[in-house]
Amino acid sequence: MEETEAVQQDIEALEREIQTIKIQIANAHSGASKDEVKIPDAYKQFLSENINFSNLMRKDENTTLSINLSPRKPGTTTGQIQGIDSSIRSNFGVSSGHNEVAGFKSITDFVQWENSVRLIGVSLFPVNYDNIEFMGIRLELFDELSLKYDPPFYVILKPSVKRLGIWELFKHNLPKYINIHQHWQLITKDTDTSDSNIMKFANLCYKDLLKVHSRVQFFRKLEGNYVNDKQYSLLHIDNMGLNVSFRLGADIIKIKVDDGDDEIIDCTFNGEKNISLLGSIYGITNRFQSIIM
């Protein structure tokens, strides 16, 4: 039943997406036909960097992200952007486009393209707020257990009021363990916010997110596994996967993991120190044998 509802939500989101694009095409002031519209320079620029301006559906919320493809020519506000964290969403409205949109031979081709490129996990999208062009960065991680994407993380960039053509960090909802300001300074030096540098910055943040995500997923995927007839059961894991406790049969094991190299640096077995599990977390299942014999 839940799967049927999820599919229905996807269909409805896709229909809204198609309707939005139809309106944008109808409002386009170019001489192109409905099925042949030009790709704006901004799109060409980012496509060359393998970057996309996505407005795709998601299953977890009202997920159609309507964007203004001509951010310097605001249109009629249609509501708040859906799918953005509440700390960010209140700062933005959505404007309908009045200029050319990405040029594909059909609306279906356009939607299919956006669905495919968003799978890479990192995407950019333009946002218009109070006649000012902002840039959004969307970071998405895939949950291998639920076979769904987690709710996205967002970073919003604003144009500098002091330096023409320079972007500045505005708002974000990244976890505290992501050194976003350090990454921004490292890549851009606060002076070079070229398209390629913005993508490098986004990829650096995504890499940090993915590292923690993969570590947590690793421990969660062990749930229910057996070692010599003793079942693994996860009891506790923090949001970074650094402090983990689990049951192996009747035994309670607690470990601490180093964030830098994913090495287990401390281990207790039923409350007593044990060095048998020290080493890479990804070899932990092989080392279980040494503590349960």
Swiss-Prot record:
The lineage of its organism: Eukaryota, Fungi, Dikarya, Ascomycota, Saccharomycotina. GO terms for cellular component: kinetochore; nucleus. Keywords: Cell cycle, Cell division, Centromere, Chromosome, Coiled coil, Kinetochore, Meiosis, Mitosis, Nucleus. Belongs to the CENP-O/MCM21 family. Its main location: nucleus. One of its GO terms (biological process) is meiotic cell cycle. It is found in: Nucleus; Chromosome, Centromere, Kinetochore. The D-RWD region contains a double-RWD domain which is involved in the interaction with other kinetochore proteins. This is Inner kinetochore subunit MCM21. It comes from Kluyveromyces lactis (strain ATCC 8585 / CBS 2359 / DSM 70799 / NBRC 1267 / NRRL Y-1140 / WM37). Disulfide bonds: none annotated. InterPro entries: CENP-O. Residues 107-293 are annotated as: D-RWD. CDD domains: DRWD-C_Mcm21, DRWD-N_Mcm21. Residues 1-31 form a coiled coil. Component of the heterotetrameric kinetochore subcomplex COMA, which consists of AME1, CTF19, MCM21 and OKP1. The COMA subcomplex is part of a larger constitutive centromere-associated network (CCAN) (also known as central kinetochore CTF19 complex in yeast), which is composed of at least AME1, CHL4, CTF3, CTF19, IML3, MCM16, MCM21, MCM22, NKP1, NKP2 and OKP1. COMA binds the centromeric nucleosome-binding protein MIF2, and to the outer kinetochore MIND subcomplex. Component of the kinetochore, a multiprotein complex that assembles on centromeric DNA and attaches chromosomes to spindle microtubules, mediating chromosome segregation and sister chromatid segregation during meiosis and mitosis. Component of the inner kinetochore COMA subcomplex, which connects centromere-associated proteins and the outer kinetochore. COMA interacts with other inner kinetochore proteins to form the inner kinetochore constitutive centromere-associated network (CCAN), which serves as a structural platform for outer kinetochore assembly. Transmembrane segments: none annotated.
